[in-house]
């Protein structure tokens, strides 16, 4: 089984069309990886599906980097 970090990076790569090697934990979805608002919504939906959780909108707005996504998943499993 892949680690949460690996799974999050794979989702980010697939959703944003970025190579996994280019993604760091500090990568900002918008500033570093070129995501727009629709991309971030789709990214949150993909995270919800992968980790079988629901991320409330007010929490989703706070998830702006790869590390924040990892931290959210870890704390809500």
From Swiss-Prot:
* The protein's name in its UniProt record: Acyl carrier protein
Q: How is it modified after translation?
A: 4'-phosphopantetheine is transferred from CoA to a specific serine of apo-ACP by AcpS. This modification is essential for activity because fatty acids are bound in thioester linkage to the sulfhydryl of the prosthetic group.
Q: Which cellular compartments is it found in? A: Cytoplasm
PROSITE patterns hit by this protein: CARRIER, PHOSPHOPANTETHEINE
* Keyword list, A-Z: Cytoplasm, Fatty acid biosynthesis, Fatty acid metabolism, Lipid biosynthesis, Lipid metabolism, Phosphopantetheine, Phosphoprotein
Q: What protein family does this chain belong to?
A: Belongs to the acyl carrier protein (ACP) family.
Instruction: Copy the pathway line from the protein's UniProt record.
Output: Lipid metabolism; fatty acid biosynthesis
What GO CC annotations are associated with the protein?
cytosol; membrane
Domain Carrier: start-end pairs: 2-77
Recall the taxonomic lineage recorded for the source organism: Bacteria, Pseudomonadati, Pseudomonadota, Gammaproteobacteria, Oceanospirillales
The free-text function statement in the UniProt record for this protein reads: Carrier of the growing fatty acid chain in fatty acid biosynthesis.
């Amino acid at each position: 089984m892949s680690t949460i970090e690996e799974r999050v990076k794979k989702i980010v790569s697939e959703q944003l069309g970025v190579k996994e090697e280019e993604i760091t934990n500090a990568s900002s979805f918008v500033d570093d990886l070129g995501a727009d608002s629709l991309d971030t919504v789709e990214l949150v939906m993909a995270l919800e599906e992968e980790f079988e959780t629901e991320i409330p909108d007010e929490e989703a707005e706070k998830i702006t980097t790869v590390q924040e996504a990892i931290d959210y998943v870890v704390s809500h499993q």
